[in-house]
Amino acid sequence: WAFNVITTGGAAKAYSPSGHNRFTIRQLLAPFDQTAYLCNMQYLPPFAIMGTHRLNTADIELHAVQYEQLLVALHNDRISEAEWKSVTYLNDLIPLPQSVMD
C-alpha cells in the first residue's frame, strides 16, 4: 500500500472543481497515484486534515489519535479493500475520537 498524509490550510470545499483551488485532493495527488501504480502498489485515499490553521491543540491531538487508530487498523488488516475504495479520505473510516482517551 501507499497513501499520503496531508494537511491543508483551506476547507474541504476549497478542493473541488468549483472551489478556490480548482482541483480535488485526489487530482492534486495524481503523481503519487501514478508512482504507486508503477511500483505495483495499491494507492489508498489520503488521510487529510483540512483547515489546520484553525485547529487548536486539542483538535490536533484528536486527529493524531485518529491517525494512530488508522495505522493500527491497516496493520491488523481490519480495513478491507472494498472499504478503502468506498471513501474519499481514509479519515472517513475511523471516527474522530471525542477525546484523546477514546
Sequence positions of predicted segments:
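Helix-loop-strand module that forms the ligand-binding subsite of alpha/beta enzymes
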Residues: 1-33, 39
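Glycine-rich phosphate/pyrophosphate-binding loop and the adjoining helix
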Residues: 36-102
